[in-house]
Amino acid sequence: ADINFEKIHFRPFRTLVLKNVEIIDRNPVADASGASDIKVDTFFRAEYIIARFTLEGLIRQQGIHLDEARISNAQMNLVLEDKPDAGDGDTAHDNLSRIFRLKKPETPKQSEKEIFFIRDVEISDMGFSMRNHGSDKTPYHGGINWNDLDVKDIDITAEDLHFKAGIMSGHAERVSFREKSGYRIESISGNARVGRGKTIIENLKLKDPWSRLDLPEFMMSYENVKAFKDFISRVRLDGDIADSRIDFKTITYFAPQLEGNRLKAGISGRFAGYVDNFDIIGLKIASDAGGFTGTINGSMKGLPEIEKTTIDAKIDKFNMTTEGLCLFLSEWMKDGELDLSRYAKGHTFMVTAKASGLMNRLDINADIYSLIGRADADIRLENITDSGNPIRISGTAETDDLDIGKLISSDLIGPVT
């Protein structure tokens, strides 16, 4: 690559200023699939890079120490590309590794060497793109396009940025950005460690236009950055959720097949696994629509394809009304509304249940208590997410002084056992 800059200003042992810096790829690669004839030759550019330091910080044996680093009006373009097969079947490569001749060692080295420490970091008005010009592309179905990622308006304020032993760590006071898909982050803060296939964030607080998340601990595990091309099945997520609010509008940018899901709820608990195969532990949920609150433990497999998604869950002490239940189920339906409002109107039920099976063919064993009586049910629900067919309920039920009249809003019958 060629490294150019318009102006350099150096105040000995205090400040270094670079203006209009750019790193130009001499041999940009065309898209192997032929989907685009664009060659990305600019790897990096920045209007200003400013570093402030002391003589002591420069001559330390532990690595470069800077008091402050500022980057403004910058752009970085990462290109995923093919390389010749060296016999190991691995043809994945990228322009960063090619330009700087970075090679993956045959035996990974666990160096404890410190590379740098920066006390204060500020990045303003930066962009980042990641284009997949390789032959291995993940099909695009909507939301964020991991084959053509384009992030703008990146603003970062951070402190104690440290790179040692192959791990980057630091405290992010505030991070914000927007992606061309329409997704945007209004603010992120937390203490982060990134490296060796993991991103660990403590006290993560995230806010976008739809959701608000508070995670005392959050971790992503992945083989390498290329795993994010198939985020749903190759990036493992583990986290503790404090009092938060989730809107599925946020999730659809990462799992576009869930487009149309209108669920909004307050949540807290723990999750572990991949988007398409995860466990939830002690997840407390309260639907924004009301009438549907409780705790869930279990697993879900198959997302984002709702028709193939399976559930194995236990529901503890769920308080719900028929209005709340039908609103909750309707939010999972792309079209139409489920209406059970004429049944048991105004009555609250406490439910303990087990559910298993496909989302569209769900077996439920439930114990139901209320002021109008008690019931045990062993039923199957079908066509829950199929808007083209009516919901079908089959199975057996036992009641104990359950007021059927109040259940169906009729005076013709009373309590039944």
Regions found by a protein language model. Give the residues of each.
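Extracellular/lumenal and peripheral-membrane lipid-interaction modules
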Residues: 1-4
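Flexible beta-edge/linker motif
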Residues: 6-86, 101-133, 150-173, 195, ...
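Amphipathic hydrophobic-ligand
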Residues: 29-52, 66, 135-156, 180-191, ...
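Transmembrane beta-strands of outer-membrane beta-barrel pores
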Residues: 73, 174-176, 208, 241-245, ...
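Solvent-exposed beta-strand/coil patches in large extracellular/periplasmic or lumenal scaffold regions
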Residues: 94-136, 152-180, 187-188, 200-204, ...
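Membrane-embedded beta-strand positions of outer-membrane beta-barrel proteins
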Residues: 239, 269, 296, 313, ...
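Outer-membrane beta-barrel translocator/channel fold
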Residues: 244-248, 321-322, 406-408
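Extracytoplasmic loops and strand-loop junctions of Gram-negative outer membrane beta-barrel proteins
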Residues: 250-253, 333-337, 400-403
